[in-house]
Structure formats: structure tokens, C-alpha cells
Amino acid sequence: MRILAKWLALAVLLCTTPAKAALDIVITEGVDAARPIAVMPFVWQGPGAAPQAIADVVMSDLVRSGTFKPLDELGLPQRNIGTVAQFQANSWSSVGAEALVLGTVKPYGTDQYLVSFDLIDLVKAQNQALKGPVSATEFLMDSRQTVISAAQFRQYGHRISDIVYEKLTGIRGAFLTRISYVVVNHTQKAPYQLMVADYDGVNEQMLLRSPEPLMSPTWSPDGRRLAYVSFENKKAEIFVQDLYTQVRTKVSSFPGINGAPAFSPDGKSLAITLSKDGQPEIYIIDIATKAIKRITNHYAIDTEPSWYPDGKSLIFTSERGGRPQIYRVELSSGKVSRETFEGEWNLGGSITPDGRSMIFVNRTNGKFNIARMDLSTRFMQVLTSTRLDESPSVAPNGTMVIYGTTYQGKQVLAAVSTDGRFKARLPAGQGEVKSPSWSPFL
């Protein structure tokens, strides 16, 4: 509940309008190969209609993970069951799903509801049933109940999805996370908008509107702040904004380029690109003291820094080899090594949270696509087949990448799993959308 309460506190501060999806997720590839799972509508145990369909949130999350495919409720052998006590293992022998999610919702005081859910291992339940009557503890993977308010239904649905996903895959779910991005709508006087939304595009909220460009939003490790570049004062400047207090702090306003901020793993510093001394170079700036340290020193352009999870190295894009490629610099020694070699260009890299892979933009035969490279084997896999892909950002559990692309002549967001199997598009209703950034776990 501590994690849920923290997320809900942020959601309440940001949300001033009813939940809605400004970015509708359109799945384009990968559902057929997903793992079958059964999610029953949660049984409402109160008068009138249920406040919200919490199971719909869970089903949508599991589909969007690219890992699971919820079965059609009409084909399930049992209907209107909400507890493990009502579950009949023998009835599910021909379903083919690996797990079942079911639950109940009932009033629990003024604007309070008790939500209970069970996660059943169907394979184990059926195997045990062949041996005779067994206790539910033999196949019950998880069972929880929580009191929530009406405003918390959607968020708690995401929490259930996180639990189910982790129990079945061993990987922490990332459904209680958010994304930030920039919307550009030139029909408005101030066309540039810095936005934050739930990972699925719901609860979109505007943090800043400007007549001048906004770009490169990035999250702090605690999920409390965003750093971004603003041209509101007719020049590039880097700001850090607290999402709870809305307080903005100008961190960097040197002559020339101030760009590509990236929070250090401890949240105390930003790696940034500055051109105050000539060519664009990589620097680290202390957010509190504004003290800066130059990291690279080369006649070529160095930009787009990103941290290794251990905070001991940075990767960055450089033209020092003649074309944009990704390099690594060790902060203790200053040693620089080239990381990418395949294709014509490689740029905009970031390291996955487990430190095992790098996600970046690869240009081959003139096409810009999102790619992944295993840092041990150096094997590179192109993940996308969209066009003009840019700005990849990795989910905190390392399973998905959100990025900018072009669709039907407009800049939109898209997502791809890090194995390249699942793909989705997030078209916006109005304007163009770019510069996505996925939050840490909240």
C-alpha cells in the first residue's frame, strides 16, 4: 500500500479532470503469440451498478504488456464467480489458459470499497484435481484485499496487473508508471505543451505551455521531478520541475546549447550537453550547487548523454568517427570507447535498467529504427519497422520501449517490446507528439 499511496498522491496533485485517454493505444503486432490468461469481471456485491469495471483495467494492462492475451469471457467455463471458493478446477481443463484472475468489490463505508482478488494457477489446479480433492493453497498464487476510494479504482487495477505480471513472469510490472512527452499544436497561440500521463495515456495533464519549443523531458530516479529544455526565454535553457509542488528551477543557462539533460542514478546531478566552450560537449552539473564538470573534450560534436545504472559511466552520441555513433566514457578515468559499429548511424542510446542491453536509434539504408544491442555479445537487433524513429525511452522493468515516430505524416508515439515481438502505436487526438520519457517505478 505504501507504493500505491505514493503513486495516488502524485496522481491527485496532477489530475484535475476525469480520467480519459488522450493517447489511444492501437496494438499493431504481437497479440497472437501472447500467453493465454483468464480475467473474470470482478463481482459487485453492492446495490446498483459497480463504480468501475476494475477487471477491464487489468485486461487492458495485460494485453498492452505484449506478454498475455486475455480470453473472451463468453468462452470461459464458469461465469459470475469472484472467489477461489467458487472455483471448480475440473471445469477449466479445456480452457488452455495458464492462470485465472477473479475478484469481488463491495461497499465499505462512505466512498470506500473493499476490493478482493485471487490469482489461480490453472495448470497446477488441473494437475492437482486429477489426484483428487485438494486445498486451494495448492494452486493459489496470490490473494489480497484492499480498501480504496472510488477515485482509486483505476490505479488499483494497475496495481493488480503489476502483481499478476510479476507472479507469472518473475519481472516487476510497470503499469503504475507514467510517461512524459511534448505535444505540438500549431493551431494554438502557445503550441508547445509539456504533458504527463499514465503509461497508457490516461489522465493526461499539462505541466507547462509555451509559445517557444519545449524538448527532452526526462524523469528523476524518484519520479518526483522532470528535467527538460525550454526556449521560453528565446534561448535554450534547462529546467527541473517538481511534480508535487510545481516549483521550477533553472539549472543551466549558459551561452549556446543547453540540451539533452539526463538525471544521475542518485538524482543529484544532470549529464547535459553544453557548447559554451565551443563545440557541443558532455558535462555533469550538480543540481543544487550548479557546479559543473566537463566530461568530454573533442573537436567533434558530443551530445545525448545517458547514464549506466551504476552511475560510473555515461554513453553519448559523437561524430568523432566521422558519423554519429555511440560511445562510452568512464567517469573515473575519462577513458572513451566506441560501442556501436553496425549500420550507418547509431544515436540516442540508453542502457536498460538491468545494465545488460542498450536501446538506441539505428540508421541502415537510410531508415531510422529503434534497435537493441546485447552489451555482452554485441548482437544488435532492429526492433521496429516504422519510419523516422527517434527518442527511445525504456520502461523501468526493461520490457518495453516508447519512442517517437511518424505515422500518416504526423509525429506520434509508439511502443515496442525489447524482444521486438509486440508493437503498438499511440496516436494523439490533436497536434503532434514527440520526446517521450518513461518514468521510474512510482
UniProtKB/Swiss-Prot annotation:
Compartments in which it is found: Periplasm
Keywords associated with the record: Cell cycle, Cell division, Periplasm, Signal
GO cellular component: periplasmic space
Signal peptide, first to last residue: 1-21
GO biological process terms on file: cell division; protein import
Pfam hit, one: PD40
Keyword Chloroplast part of the UniProt annotation: no
InterPro entries associated with the record: 6-blade_b-propeller_TolB-like, PD40, Tol-Pal_TolB, TolB_N
Superkingdom of origin: Bacteria
Primary role: Part of the Tol-Pal system, which plays a role in outer membrane invagination during cell division and is important for maintaining outer membrane integrity.
Family statement: Belongs to the TolB family.
Binding partners and assembly: The Tol-Pal system is composed of five core proteins: the inner membrane proteins TolA, TolQ and TolR, the periplasmic protein TolB and the outer membrane protein Pal. They form a network linking the inner and outer membranes and the peptidoglycan layer.
PANTHER family: PROTEIN TOLB, PROTEIN TOLB HOMOLOG
Protein's UniProt name: Tol-Pal system protein TolB
Organism for this UniProt entry: Shewanella baltica (strain OS185)
Organism taxonomic ancestry: Bacteria, Pseudomonadati, Pseudomonadota, Gammaproteobacteria, Alteromonadales
Gene designation per UniProt: tolB
